[in-house]
Structure formats: structure tokens, C-alpha cells
Amino acid sequence: MTARNSIIPVFVPHLGCPNDCVFCNQRRISGHTEPATAQTVKTAIENAAALSPKGTKRQLAFYGGSFTAIPVAEQTALFEAAKPYLDDGTISSIRLSTRPDAIDAKTLARLKKYSVQTVELGAQSLCDKVLWLSNRGHTAKEVEDAAIMVKQAGFELILQMMTGLPGDTDESCVETAKKIIALRPDGVRIYPTVIVRDTELYDMWKAGTYKEHTVSDAVRVCAKITKLFDEAGIPIIRMGLNPTEDLSGGDAVGGAYHPALGELVRSRMMFDKAVKLLDGVESDKRVVLGVNKSDVSKMIGQHRCNAEALKSQFKLKSIKIMQTDINSGEIKLLSLD
């Protein structure tokens, strides 16, 4: 969202979920423990309106649970709480997240009635084996069918996928990304698996039946799928869980939790491009690479990891990264001697 657009989050932790996915503890992940009420909605909107500049376009967002799976009366109460603010222009629309198996024509008609603009579907994977091992309770076809229904009904569609779930491989994650691209969503969220306390996945990890999906693993596979989404022109609106006090305070006990995961992935992608560019370069050379101003830190890498890895891999005397006038994401060999 631009500076004159804002999202007002209201969390409905774990409401509506018919079963517990192995990775999920929404109260710890979202940092919210109390269910949303009409007053929660009113307070969130009024606080946001008071703090945001005049002319800001605000969208109310119901996150953290399967919104369309909660009782219709509860959905209606939350929508009705927002209605006066829609009517007077304080907010422009609503977005919500839900499960693919909680979407049907009647539900979508209700969402239209209450000015919902954006529907986020938690696909997580489009591999049936991974969905089953993760106790998702739905199939890949149900994800695809729900996504098509949402698009055909005129909503903006966001699809969420995870990496490193039980049974996942780099190949299955890439295949999920390709299937998501075929559905033509308006954006995607990518959430590498984090091991959170008080989840079945935590117990599986402790018992040795689940192998941790590390930050390094996530960076590797997310670099592959990010490239696919970039090439398809599908925006990635979030990569990795948002930091919360609970997660940062120790509830994230393993897995791919990093507050700047997206930056690490983009840095890895720049490294991979540099490796291709330098392929065949003789050893003992001095190399100068040029990148866009916005990519200098990504190309150098955290603690100069990319620069030092390139220097070591190609046995260079030195490597220097410079700002130059090229497009973001591109790399140019400026000097080789």
C-alpha cells in the first residue's frame, strides 16, 4: 500500500477453524488472544482514522482466522460494526482471510453485500500429500475451485502459501508456486514454516518426526519461487511472519523465523545472478559489479556474506559493489582486471 493507503488490522485468532493444522497456534502467531467484537472493530477504525492523514484510503482487514467459517451471526455483527464507517467514507472497503473450503456462492454474495473487496485464501500448499500431513482438512482442488470462484465473483484474490511443511520439498514448493501462478491471483503471501510452541508440529519436531525448515532452507526455496512470481508479474505482499512480541520473545522455537526474511531472499537472488554473471571468470581477478542504488546492500549481503562468498568461489583478488544506473534487480560487470 502507498503512503495514502492503509490497512486497519482486526485479528480474529483461530475463530472458525474446523480443525487444528499441525503448524498453527494463531494466538501466539498473531500476538492476539481475545476474540474480535463489534467494539474491537469500532475502536480500531476510530484509532486509525485519528492517526492517519486526511485523504488516506483505509481498508479494514479481518486477519488470523477463517473468517467465513465462523457463525454467520458473528460475521454479520462484525460487518455491521464496520458499516457506518463504510457509509461515511472513513473506510473504503474490507479484506479478510479464510479457508478455501469455507467459500461458496452464498458466502461470496454476503461478502459483496458488506463491501468486502479482497479475499485472502490460505492455500498453504497445492500438494495433496503435504496438505494431508499438515492436517489442513481440504484438498488442492478445493483451493483451486475456491480461487476461481473468488475471481469470478469480482473480488481481489490473494493466495497464501507456505514452505517447509511436513512432506514438503523444494520441488513441491516450486510446483505449488506454479499452480498458484496459473490461478492468476492479484498477490501472494509466502510464509516459511515456523515451529511455534503448543502446536502439533512442535511435538513432531521434539519427537524427531519433523525436520526443521531452517532460515537457510527458506531463503533457498523462496529465492526460487520469488523468481517465478516476479516473472509472472504477481506481487509478493509479504514474505515471512510479521514479528510479534510472542514470537520474538521465544514462542518461535525453530524453523524459518527471521524479521527480515524477504531481504535475505532478495539478497540470495542477487547472489545467484552474480554467480551466473561471473561464470568462467579466471581466478586472481579484481571485479567491480554495478547494481541499482536500491540493491547495493542486497548484493553485498548481510555481514558482506555475498561479497565474500563470490570472492572465495571464484578465487578473486577483490570484489567491489558499486551503484550504477541500471534497473533494480539487474547486475552489470563494470570492471574485470
Explain the meaning of each model-derived region:
Residues 1-30, 42, 46-64, 68, ...:
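N-terminal pre-triad scaffold of radical SAM enzymes
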Residues 2-6, 12, 200, 207-337:
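Auxiliary Fe-S-binding modules of radical SAM enzymes
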Residues 13-16, 191-196, 242:
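Short glycine-enriched loops at secondary-structure junctions
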Residues 17-21, 196-202, 247-249:
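Short acidic/His/Gly/Ser-rich catalytic and metal-binding motifs that mark active-site loops
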Residues 26, 46, 50, 182-185, ...:
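Generic secondary-structure signature for well-ordered alpha-helical cores
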Residues 29-43, 64-193, 197-217:
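Conserved non-cysteine loop/helix-boundary elements of the Radical SAM core domain that shape
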